[in-house]
């Protein structure tokens, strides 16, 4: 048996072992933790990525222009939303108790985000950016106002419906949350099995597609610790794209990356948005926003407002 494995690619060895062992533990872990999405992004590539200039102030900012889609609709729609933070699981308290005991984070939120838009959320640490993202993917319960995400009414959402919502959303974590003892291919394979994919050839085809999107098609056999920080973040993005999301949520995705690698991640997000997937990214990196301008929402003193890039630094 060992001779057979020596003649096979490393990812294929892991794939065969997974089929034999079923690996229910990892499937359950991935399903509960990530539950990525099914609708939205078409196959594409990122090409001709240019290195950053040594002096970014001599460059003309490349303002992002969202793709205008026929039948454009709101992927996110918030009206009069107030967000309270609690450490209790979703749905474990009544709305009345949450209003009494939860910590007020943000109030009177009103905005729409459409398919194909790339939107920055910016503000100081603790200003509520992550709390908003957690509300959008139903880690925090919405108890005041109206909120619709990827076709789901957050006020009426039941706990059993959360996995269905998250299959329409791709989530990119700053701390990666990869399976460190499985290679790139198997990290993606477990997600697909956990979210209902059955056909093995379709699974392999989709994994090949998303690895090509993030320029990791030659790294399928690598273990996460063999990848650079930027490559690990690209793997996380590939994982979020597996189920073709309508919405991609990224919480400080460039926080642990060097400036050049961070710019590559922003260009990748912009390319994903051009294919019709709404991308919402929280960050405190104002230099990136100046270099790659796009719609920006500022968080300050429990409120939000849209700001032009030119006045953003004065308000933070």
Language-model regions: role of each:
Residues 145-153:
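Conserved ABC transporter NBD signature motif
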Residues 182-190:
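Short coil-to-helix segment of the ABC ATPase nucleotide-binding domain corresponding to the Q-loop/switch region
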Residues 242-246:
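A short, proline-enriched helix->beta-strand linker immediately N-terminal to the Walker B motif
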Residues 223-227, 231-233:
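Conserved ABC ATPase signature
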Residues 1-5:
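Short, small-residue-biased leader/transition segments that mark boundaries at the very start
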Residues 137:
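Helix-to-loop junction immediately C-terminal to a conserved catalytic motif
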Residues 248-251:
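Catalytic Walker B motif of ABC-type/P-loop ATPase nucleotide-binding domains
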């Amino acid at each position: 048996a060992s001779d057979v494995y020596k003649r096979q690619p490393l990812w294929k060895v892991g794939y065969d072992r997974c089929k034999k062992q079923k690996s229910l533990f990892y499937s359950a872990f991935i399903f509960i933790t990530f539950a990525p999405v099914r609708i939205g992004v078409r196959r594409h590539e990122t090409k001709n990525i240019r290195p950053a200039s040594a002096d970014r102030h001599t460059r003309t900012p490349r303002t992002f222009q969202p793709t205008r889609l026929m039948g454009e609709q709101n992927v996110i729609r918030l009206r009069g939303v107030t967000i309270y933070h609690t450490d209790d699981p979703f749905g474990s308290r009544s709305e009345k108790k949450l209003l009494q005991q939860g910590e007020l984070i943000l109030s009177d939120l009103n905005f729409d985000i459409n398919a194909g838009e790339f939107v920055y959320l910016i503000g100081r640490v603790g200003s509520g950016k992550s709390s908003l993202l957690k509300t959008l993917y139903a880690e925090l319960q919405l108890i005041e106002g109206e909120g619709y995400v990827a076709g789901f009414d957050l006020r009426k959402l039941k706990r059993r419906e959360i996995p269905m919502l998250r299959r329409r959303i791709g989530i990119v974590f700053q701390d990666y949350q990869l399976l460190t003892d499985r290679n790139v291919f198997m990290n993606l394979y477990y997600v697909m099995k956990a979210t209902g994919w059955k056909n093995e050839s379709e699974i392999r085809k989709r994994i090949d597609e998303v690895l090509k999107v993030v320029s990791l098609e030659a790294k399928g056999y690598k273990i996460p610790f063999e990848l650079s920080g930027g490559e690990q973040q690209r793997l996380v993005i590939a994982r979020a794209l597996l189920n073709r999301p309508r919405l991609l949520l990224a919480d400080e995705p460039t926080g642990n990356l060097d400036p050049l690698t961070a710019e590559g991640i922003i260009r990748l997000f912009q390319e994903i948005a051009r294919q019709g997937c709404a991308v919402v990214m929280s960050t405190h990196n104002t230099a990136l926003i100046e270099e790659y301008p796009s719609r920006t929402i500022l968080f300050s003193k429990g409120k939000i407002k849209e700001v032009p890039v030119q006045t953003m630094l004065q308000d933070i």
